[in-house]
Each structure stands twice: as C-alpha cells, then as structure tokens.
Amino acid sequence: MTNITSSFLCLLILLLFCLSFGYSLHGDKDEVLSVDVGSNAKVMKHLDGDDAMKKAQVRGRSGQEFSKETTKMMMKKTTKKETNVEEEDDLVAYTADYWKPRHHPPKNN
C-alpha cells in the first residue's frame, strides 16, 4: 500500500513539474518566428500605398477620356549569381577538381 502511494506521489510530482516548466502549444503572442530560406526563384513584390494603384488618364483620338487603373509590380532580382558555362564535347585536361577551364574576357589595363 505504501509502495502504491509513493509511486502515485512521484507521478503526481513529475506531472506538476512538467506542467510548470512546459511550453505553450500555440505560442505566445509576443513570439516572433523567423525563418531564413535560400532560393534563387524570382519573387514578385507588391508595392503598398498610393504607388501600387494609380489611375492613368487615357485619351483617344476622338477626345473621349476614361481612367484606367493600373497595378505596379516590381521584379525582385535573384540573389544567386548565375554563371553560363558552355558545354563542350572536347577532351578536357585532367585537373584535381574536374572543372572545365572558363574563358574570361581580357582585362582593360
């Protein structure tokens, strides 16, 4: 009987200990999640504010005017530098790193 009560008390203490130092499953309101993701895909960035939506006045030959709403979108440049290496079927001299030699333009000195 004492063995059962002592094991029950140990489990109860362990449960209270886990609950007191536990973490919230849904997160706190003040927590900020930050994830760095590397990608070389092009991303469309939408401008906020008055710059994004503009009304342009369009006038035809007949003199009638009408307004056209335009949306301005900007392309974000890729962060990874792309290199163009021409594929050659010729034999390449053996090098330790197995890279083909690249042909660079001459320096302008």
Swiss-Prot record:
Residues 54-88 are annotated as: Disordered. The keyword Ion transport does not apply. GO terms for cellular component: extracellular space. Disruption phenotype: No visible phenotype, due to the redundancy with other RGF genes. Slower root growth after (Pi)-deprivation. Triple mutant rgf1-rgf2-rgf3 shows a decreased meristematic cell number resulting in a short root phenotype associated with an altered PIN2 traffic. Induction: Accumulates in both root epidermis and cortex after Pi- deprivation. 'Golven' means irregular waves in Dutch. This is Protein GOLVEN 5. It comes from Arabidopsis thaliana. The gene is GLV5.
